[in-house]
Amino acid sequence: LKCVNLQANGVKMTQECAKEDTKCLTLRSLKKTLKFCASDRICKTMKIASLPGEQITCCEGNMCNA
C-alpha cells in the first residue's frame, strides 16, 4: 500500500505503509529512509486515495531507525 505527497519536514515523500498490526510507516525519499512507529501517542487514520474506503493506521512522532 502506498500513498504519496506526505509532508515530512516540509518535504514531499512517498509513503509506504507497513502491515496494520505493526502501526509503522516508512518514508522514502531519494536520499534517506525514515521509519515512524506508534507508541502511546495518538495515531491518525488516513484514507488512501487509490483505494476508496480502505483505511490504514499511520502514525506521527517517535521516529525509529530505518
Swiss-Prot record:
InterPro entries: Snake_toxin-like_sf (IPR045860)
Superkingdom, taxonomy of origin: Eukaryota
Compartment list: Secreted
Major localization listed first in the record, in broad terms: secreted
Tissue and organ distribution: Expressed by the skin dorsal glands.
GO cellular component: extracellular region
Keywords in alphabetical order: Amphibian defense peptide, Disulfide bond, Secreted
GO biological process: defense response
Disulphide bond pairs: 3-24, 17-37, 43-58, 59-64
Coiled coil start-end: none
Record function comment: Lacks alpha-neurotoxic activity, has apparently no antibacterial activity, nor anti-coagulant potency.
Entry protein name: Xenoxin-3
